[in-house]
Amino acid sequence: MSSAPAPGSAPVCLTLWDEEDFQGRRCRLLSDCANVCERGALRRVRSVKVENGAWVAFEYPDFQGQQFILEKGDYPCWSAWSGSSGHHSNQLLSFRPVLCANHSDSRVTLFEGENFQGCKFELSDDYPSLPSMGWTSKDVGSLKVSSGAWVAYQYPGYRGYQYVLERDRHSGEFRTYSDFGTQAHTGQLQSIRRVQH
């Protein structure tokens, strides 16, 4: 699925290099890429520059494995995109633009249980620690993204596994933690922020 830019905005654009520090062969993406190796341009990705938009990178082809949010800027090596992730990956093989990342109008509702059951809390701002704002469980059973795009993290302080949650994917409804991403083995979410577009 390709995303069309909002009226008046620049089209999404991402440049990849097969060596760290923006060296070696490069490949430019303007839409989804299920496997950068199949394009024939690169065997691996070691550095990334996001020129326009926000992107989700995956460690495996076909949008599988650990997710990494890539917002506008430079990522000269794997530690720049892995950061304090719970999983350090030195390979990125599939990419897609983030849909509907309208930072000024983002809203998500967290639910304690699966299928939108139990205690709930509606958010419209960034929270570096859900427990400190009153969320009593370390887990989120389900959530609804009413507008915008969010990145949720396994631990407080925007650390651990990343889960990119968009209004235009799953109709914004993530009924169980397994809907958060292919690497989600638990519903543990302890910080969340809006995607920077």
Curated annotation (Swiss-Prot):
Keywords: Eye lens protein, Repeat. Residues 12-52, 53-99, 106-147, 148-196 form the Beta/gamma crystallin 'Greek key' domain. PROSITE patterns: CRYSTALLIN_BETA_GAMMA. Residues 1-11 are annotated as: N-terminal arm. The keyword Repeat applies. GO terms for molecular function: identical protein binding; structural constituent of eye lens. Residues 100-105 are annotated as: Connecting peptide. SMART domains: XTALbg (SM00247). One of its GO terms (biological process) is lens development in camera-type eye. Homo/heterodimer, or complexes of higher-order. The structure of beta-crystallin oligomers seems to be stabilized through interactions between the N-terminal arms. Has a two-domain beta-structure, folded into four very similar Greek key motifs. Crystallins are the dominant structural components of the vertebrate eye lens. Belongs to the beta/gamma-crystallin family. This is Beta-crystallin A2. It comes from Mus musculus (Mouse).
